[in-house]
C-alpha cells in the first residue's frame, strides 16, 4: 500500500526531484532558501543521498517511457509516459509503480488533446511490457469535471474502486478507478 498522509494524491506529487522553488526572485541566489537533497557520489562514503537517476525504458515512433530510479530500494518507481500525438503535440502521463500496480494521477484541469490516445498507449504498455496486474487512476473528488471523467474512464474499461480496497490508500477526498489486467489471458495469446 502506498503511504499518502499529506495533501497530495500520490507520492508522485511529493517527490523532491519533481518539485521546484516556489519563490523565484531575480539574481544569482534566487533559489538559495529552497531545500535541496544532499548529493553523494555513488558508492562513496558519507551520509548524503544519491540523486535520482532517470532511465529510458522504452522508445518507439510514438511512445517514450522513462523511469526515475529510486534512491533506496523498496520505494515506488516513478514512470513517465510521453505519447507523440502529432509532431508538435505530446500527451504526458506520470505514474507510480508499486506492488505490481501502476498508479496514474490525473492532473487538475482539462485533459489535453490526445490524452485518450496517450492513456491507451500507457495501458497497452503496462499490460504487455510491465506485466502489472492493475492500473489505477486517481483524481480529486471535488473536481468540477468529475462526472465527465467518470463517464470517460468507465467507457475505457475502468471501474470505480470502493473504499477499503487493499491496494489503495484510505483517502476520502480522492476518487480511485481501476483497470484490471488479466495476465493469464495475455500470456495465452
From Swiss-Prot:
* One Pfam family it belongs to: ODC_AZ
Q: Which Gene3D superfamilies match?
A: 3.40.630.60
Q: Where are the transmembrane segments?
A: none
Which positions carry Phosphoserine? Answer: 186
The record's listing under InterPro entries reads: Acyl_CoA_acyltransferase (IPR016181), ODC_AZ (IPR002993), ODC_AZ_sf (IPR038581)
A GO biological process of this protein is: positive regulation of intracellular protein transport
Q: Name one GO molecular function term.
A: ornithine decarboxylase inhibitor activity
UniProt subcellular location: Nucleus
Q: Which UniProt keywords apply?
A: Nucleus, Phosphoprotein, Polyamine biosynthesis
- Please provide one cellular component term from the Gene Ontology annotations of this protein: cytosol
UniProt record similarity statement: Belongs to the ODC antizyme family.
UniProt subunit comment: Interacts with ODC1 and thereby sterically blocks ODC homodimerization. Interacts with AZIN2; this interaction disrupts the interaction between the antizyme and ODC1.
| Job of this protein | Ornithine decarboxylase (ODC) antizyme protein that negatively regulates ODC activity and intracellular polyamine biosynthesis and uptake in response to increased intracellular polyamine levels. Binds to ODC monomers, inhibiting the assembly of the functional ODC homodimers. Does not target the ODC monomers for degradation, which allows a protein synthesis-independent restoration of ODC activity. Involved in the translocation of AZIN2 from ER-Golgi intermediate compartment (ERGIC) to the cytosol.
Recorded hits in PANTHER family, A to Z, give: ORNITHINE DECARBOXYLASE ANTIZYME, ORNITHINE DECARBOXYLASE ANTIZYME 2
Name under which the protein is recorded:
Ornithine decarboxylase antizyme 2
Q: Which species is this UniProt entry from?
A: Homo sapiens
Q: State the organism's lineage.
A: Eukaryota, Metazoa, Chordata, Craniata, Vertebrata
Q: Which gene encodes it?
A: OAZ2
Amino acid at each position: 500500500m502506498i503511504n499518502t498522509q499529506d495533501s497530495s494524491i500520490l507520492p508522485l506529487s511529493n517527490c523532491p526531484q519533481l518539485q521546484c522553488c516556489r519563490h523565484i526572485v531575480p539574481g544569482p541566489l534566487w533559489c538559495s532558501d529552497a531545500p535541496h537533497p544532499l548529493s553523494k557520489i555513488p558508492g562513496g562514503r558519507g551520509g548524503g543521498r544519491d540523486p535520482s537517476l532517470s532511465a529510458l525504458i522504452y522508445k518507439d515512433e510514438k511512445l517514450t517511457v522513462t523511469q526515475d530510479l529510486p534512491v533506496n530500494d523498496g520505494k515506488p518507481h516513478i514512470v513517465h509516459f510521453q505519447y507523440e500525438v502529432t509532431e508538435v503535440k505530446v500527451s504526458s502521463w506520470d505514474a507510480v509503480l508499486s506492488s505490481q500496480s501502476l498508479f496514474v494521477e490525473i492532473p487538475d484541469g482539462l485533459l489535453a488533446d490526445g490524452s485518450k490516445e496517450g492513456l491507451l498507449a500507457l495501458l497497452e504498455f503496462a499490460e504487455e511490457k510491465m506485466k502489472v496486474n492493475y492500473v489505477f487512476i486517481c483524481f480529486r473528488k471535488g473536481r468540477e469535471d468529475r462526472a465527465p471523467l467518470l463517464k470517460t474512464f468507465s467507457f475505457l474499461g475502468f471501474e470505480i474502486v470502493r473504499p477499503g480496497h487493499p491496494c489503495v490508500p484510505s483517502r476520502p477526498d480522492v476518487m480511485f478507478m481501476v483497470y484490471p489486467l488479466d495476465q493469464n489471458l495475455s500470456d495465452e495469446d
